[in-house]
Amino acid sequence: MNRREFSTSFLLGLSAVAISANAVAQASRGSAGAASKLPTVKARNIVLVHGLFADGSSWSEVIPRLQAKGLNVTSVQNPLTTLPEAVDACRRVLDRQDGPTVLVGHSFSGMIVTEAGVHPNVSALVYVAARAPDAGEDYTALAKKYPTPPASKGVVFDGDEGRLTEEAFVRDFAGDLPRERALALYAVQEPFKKALLTGKTTNAAWRQKPSFYAVSTEDRTIDPDLERFMAKRMNAQTIELRSSHVSLISHPVEITDLILRAAG
């Protein structure tokens, strides 16, 4: 596989063992609908998980707004090595919470939220332009039903580490930010390991927990219609923002409000 093919496959996503479409549809009609009707538990803890091409500081516009509401906020430093290691890092933070917790994921970390979100401390889930696979779902096959996102052409590898080029980061990842701000974020971009792409999800926490989703209508990293499909499938309370992939930075007020809604 050449670099471009691998890059495209990456952004379309890799996960879990394939299961039948009928099984997915039946399960989604069942427990996902039930989860959406669960009452939202009052939570004072918020755990934020960043995606690829970023680090925990990507939540810097949201964190102070949540703290101003008296919430206890933790931003997980995702190791970006393997999915199990990333999930373990998230679980360790969840273990430290003293009660109901809203778990929030951006982009690729929707995989982490979906897997770790079954933790007993998690009261609700928030997906910000994020992947939301079903348990055992072939995310690649699902994503291939939608147009290939433009950012896929900008993923490059140095050995087993991948990252976005400066041009792709500014144009396709953070396209609605001032160039200076986008370049500052590019400077702290964390590389990811190829092994991260082979991870398999075994849980679908959105089947069990109330879920919320922020669709980015101008997203060039995950197709917006794929985001809409995943949000609808989990019967999430959904908002749409005229935003690039990084709505947590370009639309922090709206993202904060969605998290507060999930917190009850």
Description of each model-found segment:
Residues A43-L83:
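Conserved HGGG/HGGXW glycine-rich cap/lid loop of the alpha/beta-hydrolase fold
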Residues K193-M234, I239-S243, L248:
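Conserved serine/cysteine hydrolase catalytic core
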Residues I249-R261:
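Post-His helix in hydrolase/transferase enzymes
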Residues V122, V126-G159, K193:
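Flexible "cap/lid" loop of the alpha/beta hydrolase fold
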Residues E5-Q26:
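N-terminal export signals
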Residues G105, S109, V113:
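Gly/Ala-rich beta-loop-alpha elbow adjacent to hydrolase catalytic centers
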Residues Q67, N72-V102, A116-H119, Y139-K144:
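Active-site loop/oxyanion-hole signature of alpha/beta-hydrolase fold enzymes
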Residues M1, S20-K42:
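C-terminal segment of N-terminal export signals and the immediately downstream linker at the start
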